[in-house]
Design a protein with these regions (language model features):
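HDAC/HDAC-like amidohydrolase catalytic core signature
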Residues: 1-124
Length: 126
């Protein structure tokens, strides 16, 4: 999405970050997504088997690019959470997709990246 590129460019123009400060996030694995989401929801999102009503609830059409973006946004939140635990600070410019439910998306959110990261951190810290 163009807004993420524009945000990154603006942060660099302001001198807050250098190009080397940014990393390409890993895509969240199916296993990570299933820490919060049902196996059926994850499978159907990845396979493009969503109903018209589910797509309308999310707010944008299904595409391979959408799936990749959602997986990487979630992976970035997981990575940022790990980095924050290790280094006391981290940023994910694309995170915050917290409207998704375990078995469905909503409000422009397919996966709940915040919940996935919290579950992952809880499993690794406890």
């Amino acid at each position: 999405m163009i807004r993420y590129r524009l945000l990154r460019e603006r942060l660099q123009q302001c001198g807050l970050f250098q190009p080397d400060d940014f990393e390409v996030p890993p895509a969240a694995s199916e296993q990570q997504l299933q820490l919060v989401h049902t196996a059926d929801w994850v499978r159907r999102v990845l396979a493009g088997e969503l109903t018209g009503d589910e797509i309308r609830r999310i707010g944008f059409p299904w595409s391979l690019q959408m799936v990749e973006r959602c997986r990487r946004s979630t992976g970035a939140t997981v990575a940022a959470s790990r980095a924050a635990l290790r280094d006391a600070v981290a940023v994910n410019l694309a995170g915050g997709t917290h409207h998704a439910f375990p078995d469905r998306g909503a409000g422009y959110c397919v996966f709940n990246d915040v919940a996935v990261a919290a579950r992952r951190d809880r499993k690794s810290v406890v």
